[in-house]
A protein has these predicted regions:
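Proline-centered turn/helix-capping motifs that create local helix->coil transitions or kinks
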Residues: 15-16, 187-188, 196, 203-210, ...
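Residues that scaffold the ATP/ADP-binding catalytic core of kinase and kinase-like folds
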Residues: 48, 117, 206-207, 259-260, ...
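A broadly tuned, weak detector of single residues within folded domains
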Residues: 52, 102, 153, 263, ...
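Short, hinge-like loop/turn segments at secondary-structure boundaries
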Residues: 12, 37-39, 117-120, 167, ...
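Internal, well-ordered alpha-helical segments in soluble enzyme and binding-protein domains
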Residues: 41, 62, 174, 233-236, ...
Length: 408
C-alpha cells in the first residue's frame, strides 16, 4: 500500500473522521519533513469535524515517524571499549532500530561488555572479521544495513610499533572492505544511508606545549604505525565520498577513559597495577600531555553526529581537559588509595620512570568548537567525577579485568 493508504488506516483505527490527501501548495504537511526521510513530507491530514486535532495528530506523527525512522545499524567493534558504549546507547535509546554488532573478539573485545543488551530483541551479535569480504557483504544484504558506525580497529600504539602489518591490515583493509560493501549494497540509492567512521586525534601528529589545538582543517602528520593506519583509513573514507558520493562522515576524538577499557591503556592498567602493587611505568619524564574524554560523552557525541552531522564533513570530539601524564598518575593514585582506604600517597612508590617510546608525541589537544556550534554538543562529565566513577567500576569488577587479561 502507499503511505497515503497507511495513514488513512491509522486515522480510521483512531476513530477520527478525517481526510488524508496530498498537501496543497499553500499548506504545511502534517508530518514535518525529517533530514533523511521525506516520504510523508507532502501528506496532509484534514479533520472534517473539529478545528484542532493536535492530540491524536501528535500520536499519529509519533507512530508514523517511528516506522519511517526504523533503521538497521551495523556497529563494528561493538564489543570493544568505545563500541560497547555506543552499542548500548543505540540499542536502548532507539528500540525501533535493529542493531547488528560485528566484532572479531580479539583480546580487547569481550562479549561481557555487552551482556546486558545481547538479550534485547533489536540486537544481533556476529563474531567475525571486518576484513572478511564475504561475511561483510552478507551482513549488509541479510540485515538490510542502512547505517554504519565503524569503530573496529587495532588501537594500541606500542603494539603497532612491534606489529605494524597487523594494524595496516585490520585498520586499512578492514575499512576499505566495509566501504566497498556499503557502496555495493547501497548502489540503488544513497538516500537515508550513512557511513560514520570513528577515528583518532593522533592522525594530526604532535603539538607544542603552547601550540593551540587541532581543528578539522589541520593537515595529517601521523608519527606511529597506529596513527598512520588510521590516517590512511580516514583518507579512504573521504575518497569514497568524493569518488562515489558515498554518504560518509568522520569523527576524530581525543583519549577516552571509562568502564570496559582493556587494561593495557594508562588509566585501567594503572588502577589494576595499584590494586596488585605492581610498578606504574611512566614514559620519559611524564611530561607528555593528553586531552581526556569520558567514553559516555563520546558515545553521545557519536549519536549526535551520526543523526545530525553533514555528510562529507569531519568533526573533532574532545574533552577540553588536558593533563600531563605524571599529573594524571598522581591524581589517579590519590583516588585509588582513597577508595581502597589506604594512606594518602601510599602508591606513589610504585611510579617507575622508563625509557620513552619511539615516536611519542608530546601533546594532543582537540578543538571541538565546530561540533559545539553546529550540533550543540559538549562534554557533560567532569574529569574528576568521571575518573572516580571509572576507578570505582574497576575496583568492583576486578574479575572482569582478570578474565580479560587471561584472553591473551
Amino acid at each position: 500500500c502507499t503511505w497515503y493508504d497507511f495513514a488513512r488506516e491509522i486515522v480510521k483505527l483512531a476513530g477520527h473522521n478525517c481526510e488524508v490527501r496530498p498537501c496543497r501548495s499553500n499548506e504545511r504537511p502534517t508530518i514535518a519533513k525529517r533530514p533523511h526521510y521525506s516520504v510523508l513530507s507532502k501528506t496532509k491530514v484534514v479533520n472534517k469535524t473539529r478545528t484542532t486535532l493536535r492530540p491524536w495528530q501528535k500520536a499519529l506523527g509519533e507512530v508514523i515517524e517511528e516506522i519511517m525512522n526504523k533503521r538497521n545499524i551495523l556497529i563494528t567493534g561493538g564489543a570493544g571499549f568505545i563500541g560497547s558504549h555506543v552499542a548500548r546507547l543505540f540499542a536502548t535509546k532507539y528500540p525501533h532500530y535493529n542493531i547488528v554488532i560485528l566484532d572479531k573478539l580479539t583480546y580487547a573485545g569481550n562479549r561481557e561488555n555487552i551482556s546486558d543488551i545481547l538479550p534485547l530483541e533489536n540486537v544481533v551479535f556476529i563474531e567475525g572479521d571486518i576484513t572478511d569480504t564475504m561475511l561483510v557483504d552478507e551482513i549488509f544484504v541479510k540485515h538490510s544495513i542502512d547505517g554504519v558506525l565503524h569503530l573496529a580497529a587495532e588501537s594500541h600504539v606500542d603494539r603497532s610499533i612491534s606489529a605494524p602489518m597487523v594494524f595496516a591490515h585490520n585498520n586499512i583493509i578492514g575499512t576499505i572492505t566495509l566501504l566497498e560493501a556499503a557502496r555495493k549494497a547501497w548502489s540503488n540509492s544513497y538516500e537515508g544511508k550513512r557511513f560514520h567512521h570513528i577515528s583518532t586525534d593522533e592522525v594530526y601528529g604532535a603539538l607544542s606545549l603552547d601550540g593551540g589545538a587541532f581543528s578539522e582543517t589541520n593537515r595529517y602528520e601521523p608519527h606511529s604505525p597506529y596513527s598512520a593506519s588510521k590516517a590512511s583509513s580516514d583518507h579512504f573514507v573521504r575518497a569514497y565520498h568524493d569518488t562515489y558520493g558515498l554518504p560518509t562522515i568522520i569523527t576524530n576524538c581525543s583519549n577516552n577513559y571509562g568502564e570496559y577499557q582493556y587494561p593495557e591503556k594508562l588509566i585501567p592498567l594503572f588502577i589494576y597495577n595499584i590494586v596488585n602493587r605492581r610498578p606504574l611505568p611512566v614514559y620519559g619524564t611524564g611530561s607528555n600531555v593528553r586531552d581526556w574524554l569520558y567514553v559516555g560523552d563520546h558515545a553521545l557525541a557519536l549519536d549526535k553526529v551520526f543523526h545530525e552531522g553533514k555528510c562529507g564533513d569531519t568533526y573533532n570530539i574532545g574533552g577540553n581537559n588536558e593533563w600531563t601524564n605524571i599529573d594524571l598518575v598522581h591524581r589517579l593514585i590519590e583516588i585509588v588509595d582513597e577508595e581502597l582506604g589506604d594512606e594518602a600517597g601510599k602508591s606513589l612508590e610504585l611510579i617507575t620512570y622508563v625509557e620513552d617510546r619511539a615516536g611519542h608525541d608530546l601533546r594532543y589537544a582537540i578543538d571541538s568548537s565546530k561540533l559545539k556550534q553546529e550540533l550543540c554538543w559538549q562534554p557533560q562529565m567532569s574529569f574528576d567525577e568521571g575518573l572516580r566513577r571509572t576507578v570505582r567500576w574497576y575496583l568492583a569488577n576486578t574479575e572482569w579485568a582478570e578474565r580479560s587479561l587471561a584472553k591473551e
